[in-house]
Amino acid sequence: MSVVLQLTQLHQRFNDKTLKNTQKHPLMVHDEQWPSPCEIGNVDQQGNIQWQAVLQQPAGSLNDLAKALDVTFPSGLNALYGHMYGGNIQASIDGHQVELLQVWNSDDFDLLQQNITGHVLMKRKLKQPETVFIGLTAQDDLLVCVLLHSGEVCLEYVGKKTHHVLAANIEEFLQALEV
């Protein structure tokens, strides 16, 4: 199954579970200066807005960034960040609580590329295998990353090498996530 289909289904499962548990779509703190096409409804009394993932039109691409960094991104990374706008997805895998990072709007996509650039350059400076982060964990300094040379999705402490493989690739990672 493609990354696009896996991601679409993951967003749907996350939305369905949230609706079942809260009678609302997933919530995000509303920021008038940071609007998203995935926002639905009105801001609630706590300052939150409901959201539902929507297709990016046109689709985002990391190809120019890959060329600028002189790297090849693993298959599926473009789809993971360039297919949909949405909030982050809370899930678990292999006993770890993770937050899959997603793109909220076109400005967020630009910011993501800046963050990826900084991360790759940091890995080069440390002479470590290059990775791209795709998620967070309950531990502040533990990231979910994709190894560029293999495509494996791994856990990585900030500034350290990856130390635990979660999935062989992005597609298998998305399939294994439980919401």
Swiss-Prot record:
Extract one GO cellular component term from the record: cytoplasmic side of plasma membrane
Stated family: Belongs to the Syd family.
Family matches, as NCBIfam families: PRK04968.1
Q: What is this protein called?
A: Protein Syd
Origin: domain of life: Bacteria
Name the InterPro entries for this protein.
Syd (IPR009948), Syd_sf (IPR038228)
Its main subcellular localisation, reduced to a broad class, is membrane
UniProt cross-references to Pfam families, sorted A to Z: Syd
Q: How does it sit in the membrane?
A: Peripheral membrane protein
The top of its lineage is: Bacteria, Pseudomonadati, Pseudomonadota, Gammaproteobacteria, Alteromonadales
Keywords carried by this UniProt record: Cell inner membrane, Cell membrane, Membrane
State where the protein is found: Cell inner membrane
Entry function: Interacts with the SecY protein in vivo. May bind preferentially to an uncomplexed state of SecY, thus functioning either as a chelating agent for excess SecY in the cell or as a regulatory factor that negatively controls the translocase function.
